[in-house]
């Protein structure tokens, strides 16, 4: 059915004007959602001003590598984390942020002619980056990672559409397909076992065959053989990055379940809404988009900054897009996202990742289950590509997440020595597993290259240098000059680290003068650390909130553009209260007790 939103008197709501359409194409190998090519551009207009950038020298690259090595938490041990690194944010924010990143951007970290970690020096010219470095995901919060996107575009044939159709339930056509976890158990709660991602092993043979044809056309024979061998346990979801670790996989599952519960609710309640796919999809998107601002952004960002951006209708974001369009008239695709956001500021979430989690009663407190905690390594292994799913190619029941431990619904500190039910602080220290990433670099014969690919901090710092991002001070100055922030640039970042003399002395002693020309990603983390690490500082908050709010306002059908609030929704909790928190989202979806 067509969803019609009626106003109830008064002036018509201001509607954002949609930008140019992005260019759709065949999905990347192994994904289901169609690719939608769009632009990246600089929020700080590219200038021939050396002081705005890191020095263009090989020595700078070496010092970035040294800085990356210093960003790993040295207090943590193989079995415990430093409790002083705990923030006040529940751990769901880490993986909620990852899900949102996958909604907006794709293929920004691949080695290529435009962006390279290995050959990061010299940096790529700004004009080349803006004309050739492309986003491969629709820059909209439209849940294409859940629903597959719009299957219309060049090269989108019957096989692409057939695989997208596999996302839907095979007989209950208004619902999304979900998977069922299998023994061994026990379940972590008294809910059902239908809490695995859908996998290719459970779909019709015609869907599997279409997926294999698409993969074979795009892969080497060796890669295709591996893809074919592992297809049964591979998740059939729009963006396969949402099955790279178990927490984001279970977060993705909550959307499938929310959609299905919306269908059930509309069928069993006299709301006036038709209980069909379109209604459930529209309501799922609206609730999700409202929570982005009121739940996620106001958790990780300074709420004052978020309100300022919303009230200003993200004017600085739309000015950025207009300036980019003017610079790139002949090469633009439209719907640009800021490079400073996607390759620096939004990577703040890496610092929130824990090495250990109080995951559920089987892998967490009270410690009488299977293991006293879940390691990050295990959370990567119990996925479609992790190699630990059982012979049934499905998630074991004992690995279903207990969301009460991740959403703040059942908090617990770390006084007993086990992991707190909190994310790590947003600061300049990363958990030790991020020094040696589990699934990266294994195909590199050269040990130095393998070490580079596995070290997340070095990767982020090199990528920012290679893409010629402005320094933190340059971005901060620009935001201040245009009235987007009220604070002044941090002239000497090393002064923030009096309690970390080694880091302080390193920054001040670098030939690249990192203390006053600070890599943007590090600057955003340092700014947050100086404020306590429980949320981003003003610069980080401004860039993240401006991008998210701008993306929502650029979509005339988004919750923010329409002025949607959960109390307007026909969907309610059992006590008739609105679904207005991430905990209520999980409970409505029946993935949290």
Language model segments and positions:
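Terminal regions of secretory-pathway proteins
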Residues: 1-241, 246, 264-593
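Juxtadomain coupling helices with adjacent low-complexity linkers
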Residues: 256-259
């Amino acid at each position: 059915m067509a969803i019609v939103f009626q106003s109830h008197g008064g002036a018509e709501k201001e509607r954002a004007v949609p930008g140019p359409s992005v260019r759709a194409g065949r999905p990347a190998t192994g994904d289901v959602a169609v690719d939608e090519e769009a632009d990246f551009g600089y929020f700080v207009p590219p200038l021939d001003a050396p002081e705005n950038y890191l020095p263009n020298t090989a020595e700078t690259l070496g010092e970035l590598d040294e800085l990356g090595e210093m960003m790993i938490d040295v207090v943590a041990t193989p079995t415990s984390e430093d409790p002083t690194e705990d923030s006040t944010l529940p751990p769901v924010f880490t993986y909620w942020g990852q899900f949102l990143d996958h909604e907006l951007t794709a293929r920004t970290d691949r080695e290529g002619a435009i962006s390279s970690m290995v050959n990061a020096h010299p940096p790529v010219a700004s004009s080349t980056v803006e004309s050739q470095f492309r986003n491969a995901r629709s820059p909209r919060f439209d849940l294409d990672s859940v629903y597959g996107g719009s299957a219309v575009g060049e090269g989108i044939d019957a096989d692409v559409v057939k695989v997208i159709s596999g996302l839907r339930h095979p007989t209950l056509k208004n619902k999304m397909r979900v998977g069922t976890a299998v023994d061994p158990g026990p379940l972590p709660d008294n809910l059902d076992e239908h809490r695995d991602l859908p996998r290719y092993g459970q779909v019709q043979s015609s869907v599997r065959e279409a997926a294999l044809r698409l993969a074979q056309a795009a892969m080497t024979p060796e890669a295709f053989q591996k893809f074919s061998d592992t297809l049964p346990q591979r998740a059939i979801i729009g963006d396969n990055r949402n099955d790279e670790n178990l927490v984001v996989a279970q977060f993705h599952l909550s959307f499938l379940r929310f959609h299905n519960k919306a269908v059930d609710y509309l069928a069993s309640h006299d709301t006036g809404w038709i209980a069909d796919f379109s209604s459930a999809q529209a309501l799922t998107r609206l609730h999700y988009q409202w929570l982005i601002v009121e739940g996620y952004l106001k958790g990780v960002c300074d709420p004052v900054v978020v309100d300022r951006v919303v009230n200003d209708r993200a004017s600085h974001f739309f000015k950025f897009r207009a300036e980019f369009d003017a610079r790139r008239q002949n090469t633009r695709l439209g719907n640009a996202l800021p490079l400073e956001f996607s390759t620096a500021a939004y990577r703040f979430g890496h610092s929130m990742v824990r090495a250990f989690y109080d995951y559920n009663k089987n892998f967490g407190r009270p410690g009488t289950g299977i293991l006293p905690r879940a390691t990050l390594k295990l959370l990567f292994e119990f996925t479609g590509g992790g190699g630990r799913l059982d012979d049934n190619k499905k998630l074991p029941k004992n690995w279903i997440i207990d969301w009460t431990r991740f959403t703040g619904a059942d908090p617990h500190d770390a006084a007993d020595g086990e992991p707190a039910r909190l994310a790590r602080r947003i600061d300049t220290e990363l958990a030790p597993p991020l020094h040696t990433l589990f699934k990266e670099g294994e195909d590199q014969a050269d040990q130095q290259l393998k070490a580079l690919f596995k070290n997340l901090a070095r990767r982020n710092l090199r990528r920012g240098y290679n893409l010629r991002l402005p320094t933190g001070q340059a971005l901060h100055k620009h935001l201040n000059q245009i009235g987007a922030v009220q604070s002044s640039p941090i002239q000497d970042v090393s002064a923030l680290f009096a309690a970390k003399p080694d880091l302080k002395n390193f920054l001040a002693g670098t030939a690249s003068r990192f203390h006053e020309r600070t890599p943007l990603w590090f600057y955003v983390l340092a700014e947050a650390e100086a404020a306590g690490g429980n949320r981003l500082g003003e610069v980080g908050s401004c860039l993240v909130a401006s991008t998210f709010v701008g993306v929502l306002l650029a979509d005339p059908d988004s919750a923010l553009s329409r002025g949607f609030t959960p109390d307007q929704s026909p969907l309610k909790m059992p006590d008739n209260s609105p679904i207005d928190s991430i905990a209520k989202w999980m409970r409505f979806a029946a993935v949290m007790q």
